[in-house]
Amino acid sequence: MGFFMDTNSSAPNRKPDWLRAKLPSSPAYKEVRDIVDTHQLHTVCQSAQCPNMGECWSRGTATVMILGNVCTRSCTFCAVQTGQPTEFDIGEPARVADAVHTMGLKHCVVTSVARDDLKDGGASVWAATIRAIRHRNPGCGIEVLTADFRGVAEHLDIVLDAEPDIFNHNLETVERLQRPIRRTA
């Protein structure tokens, strides 16, 4: 049995329901957008052009991306802008903590761009952000999704010493595909 398409039909091919995304219109979506804008934050949702942004923001959640929105690497699988980032913003950890408080989150997720231009790869900013969230939002679970810090264990220890509740790092692919897929990741 084959699949045949009626090329004479004027009816458009419709996507299946599970593939269609609704335009974001909920009050929660607007509220998250306003909080992100007011606190001058970046989200991986926006920077990586995530197709699920409308769904997540409509549920009142977003993944904050610290250390700016320009990555020092240019991974083939990622839509985040690459280049030479500007200086990191020392007020960012406090603004992230305030946004978590404003959103009333019981669990927050924070990620970042890779910052190979910084001596510690941004580990000290990670630690400051975790501590600021914890101080402003006691009881809020903190999940982090970090860059690899170029494999420098001391930089990783800086983040771990701040005691995030959940520590993540994406591998993206199997070992034999690391070089072709993740040349700089």
Where are these regions (language model features)?
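Flexible, acidic/Gly-rich N-terminal and inter-domain linker regions that tether
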Residues: 1-73
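Conserved AdoMet/S-adenosylmethionine-binding subsite of the radical SAM
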Residues: 93-102, 106-108, 112-185
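Acidic/polar active-site rim loop that often engages polyanionic ligands
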Residues: 12-15, 78-81, 113, 138
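Residues that scaffold the ATP/ADP-binding catalytic core of kinase and kinase-like folds
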Residues: 53, 74, 78, 177-180
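Catalytic cores of large soluble enzymes that bind and process phosphate-bearing ligands
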Residues: 20, 24, 88, 121
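Iron-sulfur (Fe-S) cluster-binding segments and ferredoxin-like electron-carrier domains
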Residues: 54-65, 77-95
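Fold-independent oxyanion-binding glycine-rich loops
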Residues: 53, 67-69, 81, 113, ...
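Generic secondary-structure signature for well-ordered alpha-helical cores
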Residues: 37, 41, 55, 80, ...
